[in-house]
């Protein structure tokens, strides 16, 4: 068995260790409390700043306050307006002679001591001054003989019949290198009887040619 002195020493050491542990625990608790207090103070400071911002937002700016005061001091719009004498509409007064700008075109400005230059006519004035020429076609002005008129009366139905026969044809037929278009021009613009007679003969030949082609198909 160990002596009583050793037991006492061991007990003292244990008590010292427990005391040190207790002191460490106390220090940690104090530091923890301090940190908690700092956090609380930070939160309170943030809340104070937020409340200050809200107060500033709720408070109108100085300019708005001045506008509110001015609108309150101004007379109400419901008050009847003062009667004003009716004023008639006055048109714009004509410009004074001295204020008119002088033309500075080269063809209107005159040198001192020389007569003013004549104004050059514009295209619009030329168009208005020119006499209009009557548009007359060759058909309206010509004077056909009775024989020429009779030939034309026979050519036109033949040309119309050729047109009806050529509607379903893919190729354009010709007689003596004359097509339906050239025969129509000859009938409209030729005045001599022999020319119209040849046109009638060619038109009848072309009509017979179209008829023969359509019968073959």
From Swiss-Prot:
Keywords: Host nucleus, Host-virus interaction, Late protein, mRNA processing, Phosphoprotein, Viral capsid assembly, Viral genome packaging, Viral release from host cell. Pfam families: Adeno_L433K_22K. Residues 123-136 have a biased composition (Basic and acidic residues). Transmembrane segments: none annotated. Residues 69-78 have a biased composition (Low complexity). Residues 1-142 are annotated as: Disordered. Residues 24-68 have a biased composition (Acidic residues). It is found in: Host nucleus. Induction: Expressed in the late phase of the viral replicative cycle. Phosphorylated in vitro by human PKA and PRKDC. PRKDC inhibits, whereas PKA activates the splicing factor. Residues 160-187 are annotated as: Necessary for nuclear subcellular location. InterPro entries: Adeno_L4-33K/L4-22K (IPR021304). GO terms for cellular component: host cell nucleus. One of its GO terms (biological process) is mRNA processing. Residues 166-186 are annotated as: RS-repeat. It comes from the Viruses. Promotes alternative splicing of late transcripts by promoting splicing at weak 3' splice sites. Required for the temporal activation of major late pre-mRNA splicing at late times of infection. Induces the splicing and expression of the late capsid vertex protein. Homooligomer. Interacts with DBP; this interaction occurs at a unique vertex during genome packaging. Interacts with IVa2; this interaction occurs at a unique vertex during genome packaging and seems to potentiate IVa2 and 33K oligomerization. All late proteins expressed from the major late promoter are produced by alternative splicing and alternative polyadenylation of the same gene giving rise to non-overlapping ORFs. Expression of packaging protein 2 and splicing factor is controlled by a L4 promoter distinct from the major late promoter. Belongs to the adenoviridae splicing factor family. The tiny Arg-Ser repeat region (RS repeat) is necessary for the splicing enhancer function. This is Protein 33K.
